[in-house]
UniProtKB/Swiss-Prot annotation:
This is UPF0756 membrane protein YtwI. Keywords: Cell membrane, Membrane, Transmembrane, Transmembrane helix. It is found in: Cell membrane. One of its GO terms (cellular component) is plasma membrane. The keyword Ribonucleoprotein does not apply. It comes from the Bacteria. It holds the Pfam family DUF441.
Amino acid sequence: MFTQANLFLILLLAIALIAKNQSLLFAVSVLLIIKIVGLDQKLFPTIQSKGINWGVTIITIAVLVPIATGEIGFKQLGEAMRSSYAWIALGAGIAVALIAKNGLTLLENDPHITTALVIGTILAVALFGGVAVGPLIGAGIAYLAMQIVKLFTS
């Protein structure tokens, strides 16, 4: 019961409680319950391999709700596109999606980088009120930085 993994999760649970971070609290609680119930061997591989995609899908659904409810329609889109801020947001959305695309590959292929990114994300979520989309975009930024370093060192 008191494995290194469980102790680490309990530590994260304590950090989540102290930081009053509901997302981290929920995530760690779910993982601990899965382990306690004994379903970790069955569920963890699937969660690990598909969880990021599930998360992106849930975020996408949440973002599309105003369109589904009719709160945002073609009229609002047309009005927004007349704003310079909308064009900046459009460009930022494209840039982030392209950066994150390479981050997904990096997360899947490099456990060393994944560990550092996950710890960084946990710290940001627990201590600074960050949002746990960090590993994906963080990996994308790391990938971009690595490519720049390669450019100047090879």
